[in-house]
Regions:
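Short helix-perturbing small/polar motifs within transmembrane alpha-helices
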Residues: 4, 18, 25, 93-134
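Membrane-interfacial segments
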Residues: 30-38, 63, 67, 87, ...
């Protein structure tokens, strides 16, 4: 009996790892496509949320549990830090992941309604990488220029991101 439980647990962990890896692949592919184009850069969180939604919902079906949701929410923010981005992304990713876990758990990981609401909050995990555009504006653009992006890119992003755009993101 104990061996059967371990096998089921191992399958769940493998499935969770697979879906987290698929989510990261979607994140990286969309990031590579969007990063050089200012308007796509600003749409990146929404594009990742849209294209990763089937992966998220399948993950909840095949590997229900808090750890897969939380790790999938936090790992991209750690990836951003590791690649030289401003390190405040986890300040948004951790609460977004925790809220997503609580909402999915409320529906016992089986309710489409609660899983969809959970995905909505989960998708905020990437917003931490964009928050500096508004709260650390000068530092963000200086850091972005030093990171190799063009002045034209920075000027376009600056023009497209007045304060009133923050709640729309």
């Amino acid at each position: 009996m104990d061996n059967q439980k371990n096998t089921k647990s191992s399958r769940g962990a493998i499935a969770a790892g697979l879906f987290i890896a698929l989510y990261l692949v979607i994140f990286v592919i969309i990031g590579v496509i969007c990063m050089p184009i200012a308007i796509l850069f600003l749409l990146m969180p929404e594009l990742v949320a849209f294209f990763a939604a089937p992966i998220y919902h399948t993950m909840l079906t095949k590997a229900p549990g808090w750890i897969s949701i939380f790790l999938a929410a936090v790992i991209p923010s750690l990836f951003l830090i590791a690649t030289g981005h401003i390190p405040i992304a986890p300040l948004v990713a951790v609460p977004a992941g925790l809220i997503a876990v609580l909402l999915a758990k409320k529906g016992q990981y089986k309710s489409f309604k609660w899983n969809a609401i959970s995905h909505m909050f989960f998708s905020l995990n990437l917003f931490g990488g964009f928050l500096p555009i508004w709260v650390m504006r000068d530092y963000f653009f200086q850091h972005t220029l030093e990171g190799g992006m063009s002045k034209a890119f920075c000027d376009t992003v600056r023009a497209l991101t007045p304060w009133w755009v923050l709640p729309l993101m």
